Amino acid sequence: MSLPKKKIGIFAFFLLTVFTITLKTYFSYYVDFSLGVKGLVQNLILLMNPYSLIALVLSVFLFFKGKKAFWFIFIGGFLLTFLLYANVVYFRFFSDFLTFSTLNQAGNVESMGGAVSASFKWYDFVYFIDTIIYLAILIFKRKWLDNRAFSKKFVPVVMATSVALFFLNLAFAETDRPELLTRTFDHKYLVKYLGPYNFTVYDGVKTIENNQQKALASEDDLTKVLNYTKQKRTEPNPEYYGAAKKKNIIKIHLESFQTFLINKKVNGKEVTPFLNKLSSGNQDFTYFPNFFHQTGQGKTSDSEFTMDNSLYGLPQGSAYSLKGDNTYQSLPAILDQKQGYTSNVMHGDYKTFWNRDQVYKHFGIDNFYDATYYDMSDDNIVNLGLKDKPFFKASADYQSKMKKPFYSHLITLTNHYPFTLDEEDASIDKPNTGDSTVDGYIQTAHYLDQALEEYITDLKKKGLYDNSVIMIYGDHYGISENHNNAMEKLLGEKITPAKFTDLNRTGFWLKVPGKSGGVNKEYAGQMDVMPTLLHLVGIDSKNYLMFGSDMFSKQHNNVVPFRNGDFITEDYKYVNGKIYSNKDNELLTEKPKDFDKNKKQVEKDLEMSDSVLNGDLFRFYKNPDFKKVNPGKYEYKSGPKGNEKK
């Protein structure tokens, strides 16, 4: 006699479980997670991304028969639900998603316990109502279930469909956000495009890779690096050593700034009139016109990383995302331990971007003023976040109340791709290159220059200018090689590979209290900032592992390596396997005498720096001048301006 049709078969129970977990995931996307979903494509991706892993995991249990199949599907569904809800609770408290590295930090686990009790919402039953119903059926209504096995020959079809759905999801995601998995900008981006379950798998794979690399490392590897970097160390310049002891340090990041803008006019108007003044040598600032960015795929995050650690970023991906839980001996922590500085970062975007909320803890940064500390009303936002003028104004107000001496890093945003600006903020006409990116870049750079001038004026009014080291720099290029045709129109010259390397100058301006300004033509890069600042405040650098050299030192190394292995010196540049003269950018027919030595040094620098990151070698370093940072003691709470926008 056949069983009644109303009974629930194993495959039907599987589909029901997949469907209800997916519904709960959608619910979390729109109610609990702030993912910044925009447009039709991103909403379609959001609809698609939970299915693949849920179905793949639960389909394994279709191989079982009878009661076992139902119970295994139920348990698998419960574990996925638990993972989802754990992320919901964690996100409510930390505005981020759970990772294996955060779970391994005792401080985070303890905070999580408090977060659960503090973060319950009245609607949380939604996450478990299906679990309760299924459990009741399995215990009390077993007669509703059809225990006949699901045909095993169809299980691989279900699995293959799940895998195909994942790759379709990934294709859509890569179309909307290229290099999603290689650059890993932000956990929110990964969850938005892949879903929380695939994100957990991705994080697990990366954690295993990192742990394997660390497991192979030893103190011997550290010794090799220390011996190498000690040979590179340069003696400080007595004229500058200790000149800024216990002075505030204000580090200003000019987003996507390139120095071809200095003294550049468009339609008869200066693009950067304020920076032009600072570059003249007649102001309080020393200008380094031959200062280059040294970033890789991590762009802005690489710039921050390099300048605070004197290490190179990774050859692929971002060190912030992939090596964020390493041990470091960073500039903020050294300043704190040696001279009692408090440190902070100020940024008009949310704290999870580039994994900053985790990385900064390992750098020993005390406070993080993210978007929740600023007025993020629509009038104040453009492109990726807060406009530079309101950002600088609010930041100066915060700085005027800070304990001194402080180390404060301000990260601007308006001069960021795609370089769009509200009409009321545009005060210079665009050029007419026919390329909206290049044309817009002129307007946003002009706005940035105005905002910077207003900020410096504010510092003077608040009594912070005279007693502060002020450092201004561009983080990376803004205009890529894809826009060479438009750049040729703008600059009136051909953009060759050699010329494009010249355009990687991003500028460095430094004001040291009590010192007159000028123009310093040394060739330098972001790697050199940390040793320079340590010497300026009078901290001996001999026991710190750094790859850069003091820019004021008479022994300063004028070879500037790039992350891809290219490099530039005072006389020539090595680009894509070819050597060009700096005078005219023409190919050299003979190798310079010091070329092989310099090339070998660049390769060794990159190799050694990579070994520090991949092996997490600082964990082995018993530095008499440094106490290891405990990331668990740092917590970056949201500011008074409220929660993140949905």
From Swiss-Prot:
Residues the UniProt record annotates as site (Cleavage): A217, S218
Enzyme class: transferase
TM ranges: 8-28, 44-64, 69-89, 120-140, 154-174
Topology, Extracellular side: 29-43, 90-119, 175-646
Pathway where this protein functions: Cell wall biogenesis; lipoteichoic acid biosynthesis
GO BP annotation list: cell wall organization; lipoteichoic acid biosynthetic process
EC identifiers of the protein: 2.7.8.-
Stored InterPro entries: Alkaline_phosphatase_core_sf, LtaS-like, OpgB/LTA_synthase_biosynth, Sulfatase_N
One GO CC term on file: extracellular region
SUPFAM superfamilies given in the database record: Alkaline phosphatase-like
Active-site residue list: T300
Residues the entry annotates as binding substrate: H416
Cytoplasmic side: 1-7, 65-68, 141-153
UniProt keyword Kinase present: no
Protein name (Swiss-Prot/TrEMBL): Lipoteichoic acid synthase
